[in-house]
């Protein structure tokens, strides 16, 4: 049985970023995901303007950006529209396939171990360890 300082369940943007920072600090990290990367995501690729805070991880956002949103219409009470226009983007659309995969690659490059094709089922916490229980996706029919 392999031992890790940290096990991160889910290698999406949050999990991969957590694994990246933990591995960068010298922790032994297992990054587990039920999918195999690169993988498609059914959900949208919208990110808020705060992605710029991650420039130290991703140096070239143009590799992932589909579009920058600088205008939006919001409907308030009684369905009255409010047209919001900004000189700077306030929302970005990205390609999740490439973006998520690149974050996983960065985590692995820092030393995280990527374990693909299994899902965390449960975990048991004891005084000196946490036991992570999982099953292989080949034994089950997984879908996003």
Residue locations for each model-derived region?
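Small-residue (primarily alanine) positions within well-ordered alpha-helices
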Residues: 11-14, 18-19, 23, 107
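N-terminal FAD cofactor-binding segment of flavoenzymes
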Residues: 38-73
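Conserved N-terminal helical subregion
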Residues: 61, 74-144
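Short, glycine/charged-enriched secondary-structure capping and boundary segments
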Residues: 22, 44-47, 129-130
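Glycine-rich FAD pyrophosphate-binding loop
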Residues: 7, 23-43
């Amino acid at each position: 049985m392999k031992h890790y300082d940290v096990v991160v369940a889910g290698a999406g943007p949050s999990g991969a970023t957590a694994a990246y920072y933990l591995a960068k600090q010298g922790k032994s990290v297992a990054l587990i995901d039920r999918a195999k990367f690169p993988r498609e995501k059914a959900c949208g690729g919208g990110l808020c303007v705060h992605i710029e805070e991650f420039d130290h991880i991703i140096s070239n956002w143009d590799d992932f950006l589909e579009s920058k949103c600088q205008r939006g219409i919001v409907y308030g009470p009684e369905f009255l529209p409010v047209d919001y226009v900004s000189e700077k983007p306030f929302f970005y659309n990205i390609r999740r396939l490439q973006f998520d995969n690149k974050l996983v690659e960065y985590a692995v490059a820092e030393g995280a171990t990527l374990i693909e094709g299994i899902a965390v089922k449960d975990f048991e916490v004891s005084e000196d360890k946490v036991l992570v229980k999982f099953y292989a996706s080949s034994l089950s029919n997984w879908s996003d």
